[in-house]
Amino acid sequence: MQYMQGQQVYIIWPKMDFKKNGMYQLATLFGLGRLPGGGTWASLVVLLTAILAKDPSNPLIFFGFVIMFFAPAIYESSLPLFKSKDPKEFVLDEVLGMALAIIIVDIFSDIFGGFAFNLPDYINNKELLFVITFILFRIFDISKIGPVGWTEDPETAPLWWQKSDTTDDAYARVIGDDFMAAFLSSGIVILMLSIYLWAL
């Protein structure tokens, strides 16, 4: 949004206040978490990093470990600024989950050799796998299908799942469903690779 006052142009960025607590800015990935669909935007940052990197796993593993190390402290420090224990604005869980999914797919696509589709020059086979992984990850994370939703809220899970899930840590719930979404989305892509190789 912008408006004129005299000869000056003022630009107002909605839903972004960079003067707030530093931990809050980290938790929301510098305001992305406050945008509509913040988790998707955060996941998209990881996807673009993977596509632009020469070796996607290296930067994702490095930043993944850094974020994983600091994320619990960031979560605890910023929690009083949120309205719930699983705030939608907190998007570091989506960053970690998407990074995990991409790393798994990257490793297995190297092992399997990737698809042999006739793709345009501007996109290689591995980039296609990453885009598919991104789409699947967001579907699982948004819909909370099956184990993803059970991890976030065990009360909605079958009895056998509830008996095996004994954690009561709020952060574990926040991060757990994204890790489950990562395993499911990357698992489907790996299954696609396996079927392709089997069909050769």
Language model regions located:
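Juxtamembrane boundary at the C-terminal end of a transmembrane helix
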Residues: 191-200
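Methionine residue identity
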Residues: 1-4
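Small-polar-interrupted transmembrane alpha-helices in polytopic inner-membrane proteins
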Residues: 62-75
